[in-house]
Amino acid sequence: MDIAIQHPWFKRALGPFYPSRLFDQFFGEGLFEYDLLPFLSSTISPYYRQSLFRTVLDSGISEVRSDRDKFVIYLDVKHFSPEDLTVKVLEDSVEIHGKHSERQDDHGYISREFHRRYRLPSNVDQSALSCSLSADGMLTFSGPKVPSGVDTSHSERAIPVSREEKPSSAPSS
């Protein structure tokens, strides 16, 4: 078995380039000691190995894509059901709110809540917006784009979240 040896000076020199989970959206998941004291963990031992970091898309960070034909938002909401999610269009933005009451998990009781707001491009057809939640917890909000001269604005309205039985086909960056 090969064990990589990491010298403490190497990690400290590259400390600003190592990702930290402290400000990521790990809903209900615990922090590791290197999230709070990243430089201290490398001075403990040169043989110390960190846990594996998640990829950017697995970390709950949303992805916004604005192509020529459509506008799409992908958001990882795996801890929420469609009943826990509210999606509203307010003039030129979309608000996604998720909240579930306290429930028991492996480590005790937990309640979660988040609120996200995204600006919609001016040429998105707000009457054709859709929102779906895949089986693996990926929320997909999408709307087609129209030519520039068409009026696309509408008043405030809620977008229903439909449930898909298959995992998300969200492209990874």
UniProtKB/Swiss-Prot annotation:
<feature type="glycosylation site" description="O-linked (GlcNAc) serine">
    <location>
        <position position="162"/>
    </location>
</feature>
<dbReference type="InterPro" id="IPR003090">
    <property type="entry name" value="Alpha-crystallin_N"/>
</dbReference>
<feature type="binding site">
    <location>
        <position position="107"/>
    </location>
    <ligand>
        <name>Zn(2+) 2</name>
    </ligand>
</feature>
<dbReference type="GO" id="GO:0005212">
    <property type="term" value="F:structural constituent of eye lens"/>
</dbReference>
<feature type="modified residue" description="Deamidated glutamine; partial">
    <location>
        <position position="50"/>
    </location>
</feature>
<keyword id="KW-0325">Glycoprotein</keyword>
<dbReference type="GO" id="GO:0051082">
    <property type="term" value="F:unfolded protein binding"/>
</dbReference>
<feature type="modified residue" description="N6-acetyllysine">
    <location>
        <position position="70"/>
    </location>
</feature>
<feature type="binding site">
    <location>
        <position position="154"/>
    </location>
    <ligand>
        <name>Zn(2+) 3</name>
    </ligand>
</feature>
<dbReference type="InterPro" id="IPR008978">
    <property type="entry name" value="HSP20-like_chaperone"/>
</dbReference>
<dbReference type="InterPro" id="IPR001436">
    <property type="entry name" value="Alpha-crystallin/sHSP_animal"/>
</dbReference>
<feature type="modified residue" description="N6-acetyllysine">
    <location>
        <position position="99"/>
    </location>
</feature>
<dbReference type="Pfam" id="PF00525">
    <property type="entry name" value="Crystallin"/>
</dbReference>
<feature type="modified residue" description="N-acetylmethionine">
    <location>
        <position position="1"/>
    </location>
</feature>
<comment type="subunit">
    <text>Heteromer composed of three CRYAA and one CRYAB subunits. Inter-subunit bridging via zinc ions enhances stability, which is crucial as there is no protein turn over in the lens. Can also form homodimers and homotetramers (dimers of dimers) which serve as the building blocks of homooligomers. Within homooligomers, the zinc-binding motif is created from residues of 3 different molecules. His-100 and Glu-102 from one molecule are ligands of the zinc ion, and His-107 and His-154 residues from additional molecules complete the site with tetrahedral coordination geometry.</text>
</comment>
<protein>
    <recommendedName>
        <fullName>Alpha-crystallin A chain</fullName>
    </recommendedName>
</protein>
<dbReference type="GO" id="GO:0042026">
    <property type="term" value="P:protein refolding"/>
</dbReference>
<dbReference type="GO" id="GO:0009408">
    <property type="term" value="P:response to heat"/>
</dbReference>
<keyword id="KW-0597">Phosphoprotein</keyword>
<feature type="modified residue" description="Deamidated asparagine; partial">
    <location>
        <position position="123"/>
    </location>
</feature>
<feature type="domain" description="sHSP">
    <location>
        <begin position="52"/>
        <end position="162"/>
    </location>
</feature>
<comment type="similarity">
    <text>Belongs to the small heat shock protein (HSP20) family.</text>
</comment>
<comment type="function">
    <text>Contributes to the transparency and refractive index of the lens. Acts as a chaperone, preventing aggregation of various proteins under a wide range of stress conditions. Required for the correct formation of lens intermediate filaments as part of a complex composed of BFSP1, BFSP2 and CRYAA.</text>
</comment>
<keyword id="KW-0479">Metal-binding</keyword>
<dbReference type="GO" id="GO:0005634">
    <property type="term" value="C:nucleus"/>
</dbReference>
<keyword id="KW-0273">Eye lens protein</keyword>
<keyword id="KW-0963">Cytoplasm</keyword>
<feature type="compositionally biased region" description="Basic and acidic residues">
    <location>
        <begin position="153"/>
        <end position="167"/>
    </location>
</feature>
<feature type="modified residue" description="Phosphoserine">
    <location>
        <position position="122"/>
    </location>
</feature>
<keyword id="KW-0143">Chaperone</keyword>
<feature type="binding site">
    <location>
        <position position="100"/>
    </location>
    <ligand>
        <name>Zn(2+) 1</name>
    </ligand>
</feature>
<keyword id="KW-0007">Acetylation</keyword>
<feature type="modified residue" description="Deamidated glutamine; partial">
    <location>
        <position position="6"/>
    </location>
</feature>
<dbReference type="GO" id="GO:0002088">
    <property type="term" value="P:lens development in camera-type eye"/>
</dbReference>
<dbReference type="Pfam" id="PF00011">
    <property type="entry name" value="HSP20"/>
</dbReference>
<keyword id="KW-0539">Nucleus</keyword>
<dbReference type="GO" id="GO:0005737">
    <property type="term" value="C:cytoplasm"/>
</dbReference>
<dbReference type="GO" id="GO:0046872">
    <property type="term" value="F:metal ion binding"/>
</dbReference>
<keyword id="KW-0862">Zinc</keyword>
<feature type="binding site">
    <location>
        <position position="102"/>
    </location>
    <ligand>
        <name>Zn(2+) 1</name>
    </ligand>
</feature>
<keyword id="KW-0488">Methylation</keyword>
<dbReference type="InterPro" id="IPR055269">
    <property type="entry name" value="Alpha-crystallin/HSP_16"/>
</dbReference>
